[in-house]
Amino acid sequence: MIRQLWTELNAAILFYTVLPLPQRWPTQFAGMSRWAPIVGLILGLILAVSDRLLAVGQFPLPLRSLLIVLLAIALTGGLHLDGAMDTADGLAVPNPDRRLEVMSDSHTGAFGAIAAIAIISLKTIALCYLPAPRSLLILLIPVWGRWAQVLAIVRYPYLKAEGKGAIHKQTGRGAIDLLPGAIALVLGIGAIARFHSLTVALQLLAIGLLWAWATGAWLQKKLGGQTGDTYGAIVEWTEALIWVSFTIGQV
């Protein structure tokens, strides 16, 4: 049992990031999607530590924030951002019957480029105004983004018979897949409540649940189902919208 969980986590790290793992470590890609939030926790830890190091190096806050956003993209190989771009191109097509075809096109259209600029800009600006505890929020928000992805996998049908995202739906175990991410979020939010602020902890819980549900639900309404691209879009937009929500009233 423990070996199976370990092999799934290894596969999730290889699939969702560019982080290297020893070749001798076993992998099992079936069922890996439930570990996406834990991968988000690993990425969040790298981002939070990097942010602190940049602060020690006295990098200006706007530059520091942009570098963190770019590092997040680099660590995933742009996987989720690419999905958000393809989704934007597809949604821009008036004819619903052609949306999946456009999303499958390897060429980036104008709306895809606009979506990428919007996501990077929103995240960077929001990070400049992110309240305390900044490091814990940077740590946990990537977990929320990927938990939202798992929620969409569990709740909604997959629109393609094949594709890079099909394995998520085909090998999922249902609502139980939400558990690893939920545990990570409960522990993280509990830490914020215990060591910093109950108010901030409750805000993170409420805002996270709102956008984790809303992004997938909105795409479901627009497309009638999900694809690998929409999973990426859910991750990116959930993160961006949570960060933006936390900046309201900070000026």
Curated annotation (Swiss-Prot):
- Provide the primary localization: membrane
Under catalytic activity, the entry for this protein gives:
alpha-ribazole + adenosylcob(III)inamide-GDP = adenosylcob(III)alamin + GMP + H(+); alpha-ribazole 5'-phosphate + adenosylcob(III)inamide-GDP = adenosylcob(III)alamin 5'-phosphate + GMP + H(+)
GO CC annotation terms, alphabetical:
plasma membrane
Biological processes, Gene Ontology terms: cobalamin biosynthetic process
Q: What transmembrane ranges does the database entry give? A: 29-49, 65-85, 110-130, 136-156, 175-195, 198-218
Can you tell me which family this protein belongs to? Belongs to the CobS family.
Query: What does this chain do?
Result: Joins adenosylcobinamide-GDP and alpha-ribazole to generate adenosylcobalamin (Ado-cobalamin). Also synthesizes adenosylcobalamin 5'-phosphate from adenosylcobinamide-GDP and alpha-ribazole 5'-phosphate.
Protein's recorded name: Adenosylcobinamide-GDP ribazoletransferase
Gene field: cobS
